[in-house]
Design a protein with these regions (language model features):
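Conserved N-terminal segment of class I S-adenosyl-L-methionine
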Residues: 2-184, 194-197, 262-263, 308-317, ...
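A short glycine-rich, Lys/Arg-flanked "PGG" loop and its adjoining helix->strand segment in the class I
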Residues: 194-209
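Short, glycine-/aromatic-enriched active-site segment of Class I SAM-dependent methyltransferases
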Residues: 212-239, 244-249
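A short His-aromatic
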Residues: 185-189
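Short glycine/proline- and charge-enriched loop/turn segments
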Residues: 77-85, 225-234, 273-281
């Protein structure tokens, strides 16, 4: 009896993992769909769906992109532009001030750390700027891309490591080497944020400090803009962690929470990014450049007020690792 040829897998199946039925943070099956982000291009496989756990409020991409899916979107010009949209929304001077403010968070607790690892450092712009405050600190960079090697050649870091912090060989090389570890919008992209936190604490010396900055899932723009909110449209953003969950996890691992901040990390880009995403598939997107510029001006004009409200789109945590294992 003739058999029909096997059905070839859909492109979306190749680029997306099976949908999960429980929360990756607490394990609850009580989920709801929080947002459906529109495809950025007509040829894009599937859409980004963000689910939220009703129990712990952890939000996550579901189904999650596979390694092939991440690679596909990484090669896409528009998706790549979204990944660093927030950084590009700032002038060079404003971006430098922002990096200095983040580095200054550490000053009250450790005026002269010997060694500092910036995880997900990219081109190492943060270490380059932080050296102005910590001229005697040795800054190293870790990134999954060769960008960090270019940063080494341009002397923005003293050591460049390519890979993921959870890679056993990376962890073995860096264990207990650092006084400070920083992660700026890195945990959102980690497949397993808990494993990433464990690895970060492993490379810290006892009493070392962990500086983390993340998109804030409680931001009111998330509800107002829906699928056009920038974090929902970024292919590599896999998780949105509530501050309370992250603080609780750090405390469970014996850390002391020193400071939390929802004001300073706010980046004025929500309206302009939403308009950019909304017009991504429109033939009028180039003609809309003046409209996007106006939205960007409005983002910046409202920023001093919005950063004091639920419209703030990011938060920052500084934690201290226990002197002795918990």
């Amino acid at each position: 009896m003739p058999t029909s040829p096997p059905t070839p897998p859909r492109v979306a199946d190749l680029f997306q993992e099976p949908r999960r039925e429980n929360c990756p943070w607490c394990g609850s099956g009580n989920l709801r769909t929080r947002a459906r982000a529109a495809a950025l291009r007509p040829r894009d496989p599937g859409r980004f769906v963000v689910d939220e756990c009703r129990e712990c409020r952890h939000a996550f991409q579901n189904p999650r992109l596979t390694a092939e899916g991440l690679a596909f979107h990484q090669l896409d010009f528009f998706a790549g532009r979204l990944e660093d949209f927030a950084e590009r929304s700032l002038t060079a001077r404003a971006a430098r001030r922002r990096r200095l403010a983040a580095a200054r968070t550490v000053l009250p607790v450790t005026a002269e750390p010997e060694s500092w690892l910036d995880v997900g450092t990219g081109h190492a712009r943060f270490p380059e700027t932080a050296k102005e405050l910590f001229p005697y600190t040795s800054f190293d960079g870790l990134d999954p891309t060769p960008r960090v090697e270019q940063a080494l050649r341009e002397e923005r870091v003293e050591e460049a490591h390519i890979g993921d912090l959870t890679d056993p060989w990376v962890l073995a090389r860096l264990r207990s080497r650092y006084d400070v570890v920083s992660m700026f919008h890195h945990l959102e992209q980690a497949p397993n944020p808990r494993a990433e936190l464990r690895a970060a604490l492993a490379v810290l010396r006892p009493g070392g400090h962990l500086l983390i900055e993340l998109a804030d899932p409680r931001c009111a723009f998330a509800a107002l803009l829906g699928g056009w909110w920038l974090p929902y449209g970024r292919p590599r953003l896999l998780h949105l962690l509530p501050m309370a969950n992250l603080c609780a996890e750090l405390k469970t691992r014996g850390c002391e929470i020193l400071t939390t901040d929802r004001r300073a990390p706010h980046t004025p880009c929500d309206l302009s990014a939403a308009l950019t995403i909304a017009l991504a598939r429109s033939p009028l997107r180039k003609a809309a450049a003046p409209l996007i510029a106006t939205a960007s001006a409005l983002d910046h004009a409202l920023a001093p007020l919005l950063r004091r409200t639920r419209f703030s789109n990011a938060y920052r945590i500084l934690a201290r690792k226990a002197e002795q294992p918990a």
